[in-house]
Amino acid sequence: MVGLISTSETLPKQESKSSSAPVSNFLSPNNLTEQTCSPLRAHSTFKEPVFLLSQRQYSHNSKILTELINSVKRPNKPDQNEEKSAVGIEEKSFKDEHLAQKKGLHHFADLKEIFLNKNLSTLDGLQDASLHDNIQSGKLDNPVISQNRRIVLEKLANPNSSKEYETIPTVENRHPLNKLSKTKTLAYEETINQLDETPGGTNYPMNKKKTLSSETNKYEYPQQSKFHECSQFASPRSSIVNGPRTLGKNSKRADDTARMASRMKPSNFNNNIQSSSYGHASQSTKLTSQRDNDHQKDLNFSPYKSIPLNNRPYSPMSEIVGFSGSTTPLDTYGNRPSGKKFNKNSKFRPPGSTISSYSSASTLRRLPRAPGSKVHAERQNSTFNSGISLRALRKEMGNTAPVSSNQLLKDADLVMENLSTRNTEKVLREVNILKRLRESCVAITAKSYDTLDERKIRSLTTFEYLEIKNFQKIYFTGSENCQKLSKQIPLDECNEALFDDDNGDYKAIQGDHLLYRYEIIDTVGKGSFGQVLKCIDHKRGQVVAIKVIKNRQKFHGQTLVEVGILKRLCEADPADKNNVIRYLSHFDFRGHLCIVTELLGSNLFDVIRENNYKGLPLIVVKSFALQGLQALRLLQGQNIIHCDLKPENLLLSHPLKARIKLIDFGSSCFYNEKVYTYLQSRFYRAPEIILGLEYGKEIDIWSFGCILAELFTGVPLFPGGNETEQLGYIMEVLGPPPMALIRNSTRSKAYFDSEGKPHPITDSHNRLLVPSTRTFSQLLNTKQASFLDFLSKCLKWDPKDRITVDSALQHEFILGKTSQKPMVSKGSHPLPDLPV
């Protein structure tokens, strides 16, 4: 069916005959004869040029059609010059062509030729085209306004007719189309029938179409133009005559609006499918602002807002057309749950809630983390490409080369820097303190007791006065205002034990000295071995960390082993490229063995805690995994087992970067010099330790896998309250251990019966821990295949089946198969670097 705006009696017949160019497959101009058009000419008084609309192109020219409808004028006065009117129309068409070219509508020239040369008029098609234009643009007018416009145009075309129109339908009727009364003129009906019998018409034998139904439940979506930039196939569920149908189950996932797609030029199409917060903000800011304005207009003007739609909330995405290859769920703007009430078990996922492994650091501040709802391997939800898998994304990117370790570390540093902006005040305070410390560090020339200043000698206590004579080199004797502990010790009761507390730890006082060389600044941490102090080395003029071991005989032997291991590792890695803490020196002071090392930052458990136990982005976890494996490779190259891998023993070497170093070799041993049979922290304890089996370097691989899982989720993978519960959590995922391990276990009777079946185990909440009832994918709440495969190879019952360090470094999870650099949003700002 063809919709007309106006006709002209003054156009020469040559122009009418010259318009024999094909309009579309829907209507052939050869079928439009003078006899066909004569009924309408008899009733036409317009002196404007003819505008013929092709409904096969209405979705491609919807905005132009709306502008033409709004620009229709009343009949010119009798004395008005026809040439001026024609010139005005020609100028208007030139502006429309310029607007069409700007919007990328490449078929406007053919449409304009049809507009200027055809000589038909019918208003029924005009109403359909006008309605579809409004649906496509998301700005469906008020039915009253549409009806009034129809009446005005009908009056303009037939000023002498006396048509009567039906009552204007209200919004409650939910009838988006207006109907003409049954009192249509005979000429009008005859013209409609003749047009419908043309090829493509509703009454054409090859494609009969249903008549317009008054039941809105049978409405269907208008068919999208095949010329649309984002369209490839016309929807078979569409019908121009029947109009849009109501939203049902089949429309819960549908294509994006042609209104939104028409504003996106093909040159920017790839940029627009990416999330604006991830992509180049400078290129998408204007488009995003325009999209937000149109969305607000849709909420204000759409008639579906007041219509009950089978428990489906209104969304501007309800007016949708396109091909089924790109679908998106209905965006429930009004009923979207808040972040605090988000249910991780719900199937609902708000748009933009998933990120890829190489995700933008700027979005990490607003996305949920595992074990809540984070999905690391899926592509960012977009209105055009939500259904594309990661495999298709990688193929589309065309980059399957492994990611270099340097690139991985740089990308993780960028993400870690943006994570640090959450605690900007704390990080800046730490950076400033460390900066002042380093600026105050000045190397001092050593002096003997005979060359000391009188002022320093007067500051010595009675105990120090006798003690200092045993030191040949003196660098620091304590700050002036320091309340030294030695002042409280009488000379006749001098004993090294008086400097210790009840646990054997040294009583460190800020401003006091160690070995008349190191100035105590602060206490960094404490443990079963003793404590770690932040100090200034006045000999080297640098800030160091000193591990002060407890004054207990049982710790002395292992401390000497630790010193030997640190020395060996530093000699094997002189360039400091394998992420192991740097050993500087060691000494014995007042009954305490002290190990001097470089000063590092927070441990990874503190990082998880500062992130509210929500876990870290996968790219950061991958970076930590790479660095940890490099450290383990160095250890195994020197036949060393760490024996106590846990997040607390992995420290950041820089507060703003994802760089870590392995520390605490107090439980470490060489392969042939195993000291303990019961070691490792419980959450990271290998099964062979629990079962009392022989152990080797493989226990570090088990602990390493547990650490990566905890970094990703924010909570321990196997949080057993005791060894029995710990074994129950492991069997929940891995099932019972092999019979070979049970038979060789020295503690098998505590956990298994004579047939190797595990005894019933309950956790602290009296929940029965049933073997083989959970998976890594469930515990980690992710489907990242390479990460899950990596963990499954680290966590095996039999140590011989676990992945080796060399194989782990070549695993797909470490190497990666895609490299998409994370981008920092314009709103974020980098924190200052630490002073050198």
Swiss-Prot record:
Active site as annotated: 644 (proton acceptor)
Protein's job: Has a role in meiosis.
Principal location: cytoplasm
GO molecular function annotation: ATP binding; protein kinase activity; protein serine kinase activity; protein serine/threonine kinase activity
Ranges of biased composition (kind: Basic residues): 338-347
Residue numbers binding ATP: 524-532, 547
PROSITE patterns assigned: PROTEIN_KINASE_ATP, PROTEIN_KINASE_DOM, PROTEIN_KINASE_ST
GO cellular component: cell division site; cytoplasm; cytoskeleton; mitochondrion; mitotic actomyosin contractile ring
Biased composition (Polar residues): 192-205, 232-241, 265-288
UniProt biased composition (Basic and acidic residues): 289-298
Source taxon at top rank: Eukaryota
Catalyzed reactions: L-seryl-[protein] + ATP = O-phospho-L-seryl-[protein] + ADP + H(+); L-threonyl-[protein] + ATP = O-phospho-L-threonyl-[protein] + ADP + H(+)
Name the record gives this protein: Serine/threonine-protein kinase ppk5
InterPro entries: Kinase-like_dom_sf, Prot_kinase_dom, Protein_kinase_ATP_BS, Ser/Thr_kinase_AS, Ser_Thr_dual-spec_kinase
Record PTM Phosphotyrosine, positions in chain: 678
Pfam family, one: Pkinase
Domain Protein kinase, first and last residues per copy: 518-814
Localization per Swiss-Prot or TrEMBL: Cytoplasm
Entry keyword set: ATP-binding, Cytoplasm, Kinase, Meiosis, Nucleotide-binding, Phosphoprotein, Serine/threonine-protein kinase, Transferase
Residue ranges, compositional bias (Low complexity): 353-362
Region described as Disordered: 1-29, 192-214, 230-307, 328-381
Underlying gene: ppk5
Family: Belongs to the protein kinase superfamily. CMGC Ser/Thr protein kinase family. MNB/DYRK subfamily.
GO BP annotation list: meiotic cell cycle; regulation of meiotic cell cycle; regulation of mitochondrion organization; regulation of mitotic cytokinesis; signaling
